[in-house]
Regions:
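Helix-rich catalytic cores of soluble enzyme domains
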Residues: 1-77, 81-109, 122-139
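Residue-level detector of short coil/turn "hinge" positions at structural boundaries
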Residues: 19, 61, 116-117, 152, ...
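Active-site lining segments that contact anionic ligands and/or coordinate catalytic metals
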Residues: 23-27, 77-81, 115-117, 176-179, ...
């Protein structure tokens, strides 16, 4: 995702579009897995790394923005816009209302990770077209986090947690190394044309299905 975003930044800034405008127009879409703490750390790491990538383009504040950093860069441009969607990988056909617990936990981890918006998958999506009831529940799941748990009132609520902070750093380091390897190979577009990206995704998907089949991973 970072390499993809950087490809847009590189192509458009080379075409003469100001870096601040490009960065503010890019929005990332992420899936949310059932690994609660890992997902919180994942979103935190993504925001950290994207801010570093954007900063390398030295984005200048536009006329309607005066949020400048220490070196005069536009800090608004470095903010990562993130939309997240709960997974369908772990949803069950049997006792389907248990899916509400799964999607709620995933939505909670995304909210704590700092996403801007999210889509909660209706609990019955795996076996039928969601009806009005299941769609209303899906909408209300995230509203409960906002209106009753007040998750939108605290900036980075996971900050200071020893476990999550260390997990964030670990994910950021691994993601950054992967990002650098893609860039050294010519960038995301080159990797996409060569089929490297698709091959990596397919291999990861195959490994996960195998882990579930061998009961080494719990859904």
């Amino acid at each position: 995702a970072l390499a993809w975003g950087n490809e847009y930044m590189s192509q458009l800034t080379d075409a003469g579009v100001p870096a601040a405008i490009v960065a503010k127009k890019i929005k990332f879409n992420f899936g949310i897995s059932s690994n609660y703490f890992l997902e919180i750390a994942k979103f935190r790491a993504a925001r950290l790394l994207w801010a570093n990538i954007v900063a390398s383009y030295n984005p200048e504040c536009l006329r309607d923005c005066d949020n400048k950093g220490a070196n005069g860069e536009c800090r608004c441009a470095a903010k990562m816009a993130v939309h997240a969607e709960t997974s369908t990988f772990n949803l069950t056909l049997f006792d389907a209302h248990v899916n509400l617990l799964r999607t709620q936990t995933e939505a909670m981890s995304a909210a704590l990770g700092g996403v801007d918006s999210m889509t909660v998958t209706p609990f019955d999506k795996t076996y039928e077209t969601p009806d009005e009831f299941s769609e209303r529940l899906a909408r209300n799941q995230q509203l409960l986090l906002k209106e009753e748990s007040h998750f939108d009132k605290v900036i980075d609520p996971a900050a200071g947690s020893y476990y999550i902070e260390n997990l964030t750093i670990s994910i950021a380091q691994q993601a950054w190394n992967l990002f650098l390897s893609v860039e050294e190979a010519g960038g995301f577009y080159v990797a996409l044309k060569a089929g490297t990206v698709q091959a990596a995704v397919n291999e990861s998907n195959k490994a996960r299905h195998k882990a579930v089949a061998q009961r080494r991973e719990v859904l």
